[in-house]
Amino acid sequence: MVKLADIPEYERNHLMSKLLPPLGELPWVANNKPLSEKKVAIITTAGLNFRQDSNFEFADSSYRALPRDLSSSDILMTHASVNYDRSGFQEDINVVFPIDRFKELESEGVIGRLADVNYSFMGGGMLPDVYEANVRDLAKLLKADGVDAAFILPVCPNCSRTVC
């Protein structure tokens, strides 16, 4: 990830102007089983979608489902930002969506199982409340699927400010 000091001043000022409201108390989640028994989902902010699914649009807070067995060649990056560097994704999808690494962790017994369906949002610096309804919807899907943990992968400075 690029360091804030390494990006142009106008972009750095834009990022720093996005004040985030306090999120309040964090809900306590009991960690009642080891990682080796947990079902884990990957959630990325890279703006990825299945080739036949709808592309992400500007200021899009929705998410796309990415089945675990989907071929990398069928996954597109339709992130709307013109400032978004796609070169890492073009070389190796695992840079923004570490699906192969998690399959390896599963086969090594480090995690119990990778979820059958994983997800992508398109980051881009919108405030967290813009995503809230869709995140709550996704949380219900993850819970219904028996997911115990999610690996959330913000892939740019704007995404990091939104997710964190």
Task: Put a short name on every predicted segment.
Residues M1-C164:
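An N-terminal assembly and electron-transfer interface module characteristic of large anaerobic redox
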